[in-house]
């Protein structure tokens, strides 16, 4: 009986600790929102994909070129499905980010901000399921430079998560296709359809 009590009490304390942390996070709601959209001339049909907001204090390069796995700038993402041209996708404190978990954790100050949309493609699997994923377009699975994806102009903004503020970002720029290098005397490129695919 004492062994069970020794196991149950730490488990209950752990659950309470997690619950209290979640309540504190919920109480720290941010009034800051980012509204990301794209015009019809950039992408005329509804799209499924992931919308990103990227933030930096460094004006030397576009925020999208400062995103890194380690020591990168803060950015947040939100999945969208059937997003129409001109329709806004809202990125708020519920959107998951890295290295800052939520936009409510942004220190007040001046930043350069950019919106980005990673357009997904539909894949019908042999088991009958359909999945939406990023389609490689010869960019090496780097969605930040993948043809067809869209990005906004960089805006300089003053941000204070404690103040009510909606920053609108219009992704009107489309990343162009990657051109294949020309054939040479020694290198020829061919395409063929696999019978298995």
What is each PLM-predicted segment?
Residues 105-122:
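A short tyrosine-centered beta-strand micro-motif
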Residues 17-30:
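Bacterial Sec-dependent signal peptides at the C-terminal "C-region" and cleavage site
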Residues 10-17:
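Bacterial N-terminal signal peptides
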Residues 78, 133-135, 140-141, 145-147, ...:
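Short Trp-Ser/Thr-centered turn/loop motifs at beta-strand boundaries
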Residues 81-102:
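A beta-strand/beta-hairpin structural motif
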Residues 34-43, 57-63:
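Short amphipathic, basic-aromatic surface patches that mediate peripheral association
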Residues 158-197:
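N-terminal cap/lid segment of alpha/beta-hydrolase-fold proteins
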Residues 60-61, 117-134:
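Short acidic/polar inter-strand loop motif in beta-rich domains
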